[in-house]
Amino acid sequence: MITSRQNAMLKLVRKLAERRWRDKLGLFAVEGEDLVEAARAAAIEPVELLVAGENVEPALLAEVSSAAHPPRVIGVFRRADLLVGPTQDTGLALWRVGDPGNVGALLRAADALGPAFVALSEGCADPTGPKALRASAGAIYRVPTCAFEESPRPWVALVPRGGAPLAELGPDGRATFVLGAEREGLPGEVLAECDERATIPLSPTAESLNVAMAGTIALYEASRRS
């Protein structure tokens, strides 16, 4: 039973709250029984497992948790055990999407409407960070990820206006949908690399869609044609 704040495993979990340590160690911490069980269902086992009341004092586990309501279980996993891709012809390529909630939600959409991959550029939120993990609802274990530039062609830029209607996609819907951060959008150099531009028609009173909603709609449209 862990009874000291100075325990090495508790120190590790604290470190893994920071991206620099996740990058350096190749590990990430997962909070909550549902997310840990989702990993096991995908045949991914934790390298360490802390269970309140079994091998660690509950108050100490609560101290290292990042959740509003501390979990009963925290598992430490290897990034190397996650799926890498792309292993499909359809997916999302995210350009500097820095909000971890959006990154997690897009992973969840790729899981629900796939099979699909998610590619991430530099500057994107870490999909193995606490907020992204919670938003992905376990999809991180089932959706392959890759670097932005590894996304297969064709690239279809989702733009707020001026693109072809999304419903006019090719007959099989296979594409990499390229999305930018909500405020900045896609820079000119990325748009120049894209093969097509598509726009989701909105009502006249709506300004734009959240990036997670736009990506979800694009994957749904692609799934209807696959």
Annotate each language-model stretch with its function.
Residues 74-76, 92-93, 119, 157, ...:
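Conserved beta-strand segments that form the floor/walls of ligand-binding pockets within enzyme
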Residues 75, 109-113, 124-141, 188-226:
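Structured adenosyl-cofactor binding patch, chiefly the S-adenosyl-L-methionine
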Residues 1-103, 122-123, 149:
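Arg/Lys-rich RNA-binding interfaces used to dock onto structured RNA substrates
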